[in-house]
Design a protein with these regions (language model features):
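Acidic/polar loop-and-plug regions of large Gram-negative outer-membrane beta-barrel proteins
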Residues: 203-261, 284-349, 413-430, 583-584
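Surface-exposed extracellular loop regions of Gram-negative outer-membrane beta-barrel proteins
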Residues: 221, 418-427, 470-483, 493, ...
């Protein structure tokens, strides 16, 4: 079965073939469009269906041409886009391997319904495996880059023997970033898909993906730190240990995915589709811990010259002294070794998530009429994620006592220190769990119905989806501060009834012109972790949890021609009753607190334009532009509880967010990409992109009446607390060059891509701080907001790839 590909590989490496010189027309992608074909007269629906299902021109033109800054398309969070393989939700980490295995990727923006998924308001990305065998079933590729990793390789093979099909793929990346110290990637992903077709028309498939990765990450920092080091890519997450670079923030993942699908025809017009998927693995993220000691993070505000006020600190930062600007691992180890009882003062631990997700789906697809298709289905999903801390490195200490170190000096709660009351004063060694241990369990049931009608000119769709979601927490540690069921065992169950309704009506004026209107109304249950004030060690749920409501509408016009494709979309989305929780330090109360925000409302509206123009035989131009307004339209309510005893510090206080803009979402974008298809396999691309009207991510806490009234006592301080920072506009200029060589039916392609040719120092994103700086002035005390955290987009970088298809 595998003899043929082995022989091909031997031929490939045993010698080299002379490159052929096919006609230039073979490199011209528009020949198929201009070929004169006899018009079909049996079913005129075929002509209108092409314009009704045209691609997303704005996304195709802008995805790789806009500046590499934080971009939430249409102002929606990234997780609002649904990614599906059948009824299985797939993560971004599986996308490259699915493509290698031969899956076709279809993107449906905004509220546009997908082929097999009703979708929401944030778009849908569908992966589908086509029938048949690819013309060039084997791929081998290597690539080189100076960003995130140095070298990568991937290979894929597709084999077909009678009714059986087998696809194999792997993708590997390794090396450190040449531009940002401390950043590196070691990743390997393997994939396998086995499918079989039966004489009855039934189809069965089994997919298995295994991604394994370890990545050193970078952290945001303050503008002062970037200015002192004169390095926009300063990374405070690393330092030297025994002369070698060591990163404190390393992400490690092993998360395999298995999917089994079966499609059985029940009649000539009806098919039953059943799917079962499982995603189970471990995700780890390392961080430094410190106990009754100063923070080891070098860019903490207390270590910066603006706070210390001494010249020695400023000179050390200006000289880029790593003892000041980076983590001093050797000093942390020396401090631990001085401990009289061997207890750790500093340690490196992993925040671990052990994930197990199971999905069972069934769908019935029938066509009672050639123009009408009905979908009826059900999806049951059970998710269980267990979270805990695990000791990775004691940094020279012999152990760590598992107690709440922050309460040691507390006069009231200093005698309630145990993190795990059922195992008091437990000594933690390398590899042991400590601190917290709990699980979040979520059950989702969805029943869906969808009708799709296509006539000569009319395209209409209507769909409904009703669900039931149940969420609860289960604690495995009994914390002494919250004894019994307050922290240990199951919490109360929270129930939600999410729904989705969608309606689309489209009309084809001609086979080249199409207008559609889509309306969507839905609600979704909050994230599981957003339903608990402190899920690490507390079963207490937020008061009055509500699902988030979304209303959306969009109007799309498409026009296609021999030389021009045009797509114009006007959209409007309203998000209501959003919620979130987090832990923070409240400077006015001088306490660690649990923050809950409810009633978040956002209005997201604008227009998008995408165009593709064939300028001549060899030249093509792709254009994209958008103008929008993404703003908070309601003032959310903020509740603040003491993290120690759940005392209410703030209860449903108003946060003056109305009028603030959504962060990480440019409200003005434009891009242009010029492509030249040259003779003998040459092609080149030049693209320029712009992102403007960008804003920092606003802080909810510091806009509450309590903070503005106590800290904003002067017009200048009030403005500093409430005025949202607008970020500089971002520009980028990119170029790429490709050359393809043909060897019979095989082809070799080499490419060079250059990003950010101008080398602009572009801000990627900015996040306002919740913290306030306390400034004593005689008998009075003033407060001012801490500096915002920011990060920069990558500098000028390159990407080289060589791939061979045969």
């Amino acid at each position: 079965m595998f003899r043929a590909p082995l022989l091909v590989l031997l031929e490939l490496f045993a010698g080299s073939a002379a490159a052929q010189s096919p006609d230039d027309d073979e490199y011209y992608p528009y020949a198929g469009r201009e070929e004169r074909r006899e018009l079909l007269t049996t079913d005129s629906t075929l002509f209108y269906r092409a314009i009704q299902t045209a691609r997303d021109l704005y996304g195709a033109a802008s995805d790789f041409a806009l500046p590499r800054v934080a971009q939430r398309r249409r102002g929606l969070p990234y997780d609002e886009e649904l990614a599906r393989l059948g009824q299985t939700e797939v993560s971004y980490r599986y996308f490259p391997t699915l493509r290698l295995l031969g899956a076709e990727e279809h993107i449906f923006p905004g509220a546009t319904p997908a082929e097999t998924e009703l979708g929401g308001a944030g778009g849908t990305r569908e992966f589908r495996f086509p029938d048949g065998e690819p013309l060039l079933p084997y791929l081998a590729s290597v690539r080189f880059s100076d960003r995130n990793y140095r070298v990568g390789a991937k290979a894929a093979a597709s084999l077909r023997r009678g009714p059986w099909s087998l696809a194999l793929a792997f993708d590997a990346r390794t090396g450190r970033d040449l531009l940002i110290e401390g950043v590196f990637t070691h990743a390997l992903t393997g994939g396998l898909r086995l499918s079989r077709s039966f004489a009855s028309g039934a189809r069965a498939s089994l997919l298995f993906l295994l991604p394994v990765s370890m990545q050193g990450t970078r952290l945001s920092s303050s503008a002062e730190a970037f200015s002192l080091t004169d390095d926009p890519y300063y990374n405070p997450a690393w330092g030297y240990q025994s002369g070698r670079v060591r990163n404190s923030r390393v992400r490690r993942e092993i998360l395999p995915l298995a999917v089994a699908d079966l499609a059985v025809p029940l009649s000539a017009h009806t098919e039953l589709r059943v799917g079962l998927s499982s995603e189970a693995g471990v995700l780890r993220y390392s961080m430094l811990d410190w106990f009754d000691a100063r923070t080891p993070m070098p860019d903490n505000y207390r270590y910066l010259p603006s706070y210390t006020g001494d010249r020695e600190t400023r000179d050390a930062w200006l000289a880029d002294d790593p003892r000041y600007t980076q983590i001093d691992w050797d000093a942390l180890i020396r401090r631990n070794r001085l401990s009289a009882d061997g207890d750790a003062t500093y340690a490196l631990s992993d925040r671990v998530e052990r994930r197990t997700d199971l999905t069972l789906s069934a769908a019935l697809v029938t066509r009672p009429d050639p123009r009408l298709t009905l979908h009826l289905g059900a999806v049951l999903r059970a998710d269980r994620s267990r979270f805990h801390k695990q000791m990775r490195d004691l940094l020279g200490a012999s152990h760590l006592t598992d107690i709440d170190q922050y309460l040691i000096d507390d006069d009231t709660y200093g005698n309630l220190l145990q993190n795990d009351l059922r195992h008091p004063d437990r000594k933690v060694r390398t590899g042991d769990r400590f601190g917290y241990d709990y699980a979040l369990l979520r059950r989702d049931l969805r029943i869906l119905f969808r009708a799709v009608y296509r006539s000569d000119r009319l395209h209409a769709e209507a769909g409904a989806e009703l669900g039931r979601t149940t969420v609860r927490r289960r604690g495995y540690y009994e914390k002494e501060l919250f004894p019994g069921t307050l922290s240990f065992g199951p919490s109360r169950r929270l129930h939600f009834t999410p729904y989705r309704f969608k309606l689309l009506v489209g009309w084809s004026f001609t086979p080249r012109s199409y207008l559609s209107l889509t309306a969507f109304a839905g609600s979704s249950a909050p994230l599981s972790e957003a339903l608990f004030y402190q899920p690490l060690y507390n079963n207490r749920t937020v008061a009055d949890p509500r699902p988030e409501r979304i209303r959306s509408a969009e109007l799309t016009f498409r026009r296609t021609g021999r030389d021009v494709e045009l797509q114009l979309t006007a959209f409007a989305t309203l998000r209501l009753d959003g919620s979130e929780t987090r832990r923070c330090y409240d400077d006015l109360a001088a306490l660690y607190c649990d923050l809950a925000v409810s009633g978040i409302g956002q209005s997201l509206c604008g227009v998008e334009l995408g165009a593709s123009l064939r300028l001549s035989y060899r030249w093509r131009l792709a254009l994209a532009a958008s103008a929008a307004r993404y703003a908070y339209v309601r003032d959310p309510r903020v509740t603040l509880l003491s993290d120690v005893d759940n005392t209410e510090i703030l209860t449903r206080s108003v946060s003056r967010m109305g009028g603030c803009r959504v962060g990480g979402a440019p409200q003005l974008t434009s891009s242009a990409e010029l492509t030249y298809f040259g003779p003998r396999g040459w092609s080149c691309h030049l693209s320029a992109g712009y992102a403007g009207a960008r804003y920092a991510e606003p802080s909810v806490l510091r806009r509450t009446d309590r903070v503005t009234q106590q800290a904003g006592i002067t017009p200048e301080l009030f403005r500093a607390l409430t005025l949202q920072e607008r970020l500089p506009d971002a520009f980028t200029l990119d170029a790429s060059l490709f050359r393809t060589f043909y060897f019979g039916r095989s082809r070799l392609t080499a490419g060079l891509m250059l990003r950010n040719l101008t080398g602009d120092r572009t801000l990627y994103a900015v996040y306002e701080s919740n913290r306030l700086r306390r400034i004593p002035a005689g008998d009075a005390v003033f407060y001012e907001p801490h500096a915002s955290r920011c990060s920069h987009a990558w500098p000028r970088s390159f990407y080289v790839t060589v791939s061979y298809r045969f």
